[in-house]
C-alpha cells in the first residue's frame, strides 16, 4: 500500500476561521524540539473550523502592524471570525530600548488591534503572554512577564474583550512539573531556552 495522490481543496468562504497572531510561543515552529501552543491548537477543533496561524517568531504588537501581518488577516476576515492575540516576550525589549512599555505603548497597540478587528466584524480575544520556565532558589516560578500579563488583563477588561490568562495557566503548569521533580521539569525543556 502507498499513497498515490493527495488532493487539497479550499474551505468554503463561509467556514469560520480562528486567526492566531503572536510571537514564537504560538507560531509554527519548524524544527523539534521547539514547539508552541499555536501549533497544537488545531487538534482541539473539528474540520469545520479553519485555524490560520499568522504568529511569527520575534514579533510584537507593533511589528504586526508595521509588517502588515494584521492587515493580511483583516483582508480575509469575515463577520464571525475570531482573532486570538498573544504578545509580550519581545515587547519587553522596548523597555530597554526606551521605545515602549506595558502600560503605555503595549496597551495602545492592543487597542489598535481590537478596534481594527471589530471594524471588520471579527471577535478579538486577548491572551496574556505565557510565562518563561524559571524558578527561584525556593523552587517558586519566577514571574518575568507580570507587567505584560496585567496590562493585557486590564486592556481586555477596559475594552470588554474576552481574555485568557495564559500567563497564570503556564505558571501552574511549570509549578506542577517542578513539583513532580526538578529533574523531570528540566527534561521537559531539554536543550531548550525555557520559553519554547
Model regions and ranges:
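Alpha-helical cap/lid subdomain in secreted, periplasmic
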Residues: 11-12, 40, 68-196
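Serine-esterase "nucleophile elbow" of acetyl-processing enzymes
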Residues: 1-56, 70-83
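Acidic/histidine-rich helix-loop elements
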Residues: 28-33, 53-68, 93-102
Amino acid at each position: 500500500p502507498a499513497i498515490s495522490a493527495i488532493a487539497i481543496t479550499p474551505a468554503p468562504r463561509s467556514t469560520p476561521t480562528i486567526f492566531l497572531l503572536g510571537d514564537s510561543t504560538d507560531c509554527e515552529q519548524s524544527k523539534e524540539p521547539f514547539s508552541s501552543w499555536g501549533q497544537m491548537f488545531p487538534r482541539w477543533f473539528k474540520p469545520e473550523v479553519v485555524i490560520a496561524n499568522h504568529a511569527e517568531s520575534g514579533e510584537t504588537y507593533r511589528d504586526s502592524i508595521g509588517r502588515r501581518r494584521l492587515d493580511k488577516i483583516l483582508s480575509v476576515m469575515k463577520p464571525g471570525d475570531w482573532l486570538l492575540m498573544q504578545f509580550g516576550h519581545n515587547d519587553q525589549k522596548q523597555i530597554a530600548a526606551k521605545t515602549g512599555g506595558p502600560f503605555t505603548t503595549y496597551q495602545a497597540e492592543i487597542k489598535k488591534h481590537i478596534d481594527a478587528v471589530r471594524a471588520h466584524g471579527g471577535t478579538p480575544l486577548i491572551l496574556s503572554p505565557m510565562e518563561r520556565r524559571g524558578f527561584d532558589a525556593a523552587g517558586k516560578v519566577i514571574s518575568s512577564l507580570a507587567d505584560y500579563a496585567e496590562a493585557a488583563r486590564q486592556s481586555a477588561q477596559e475594552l470588554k474583550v474576552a481574555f485568557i490568562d495564559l500567563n497564570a495557566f503556564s505558571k501552574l503548569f511549570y509549578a506542577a512539573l517542578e513539583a513532580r521533580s526538578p529533574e523531570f521539569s528540566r527534561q521537559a525543556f531539554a536543550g531548550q531556552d525555557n520559553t519554547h
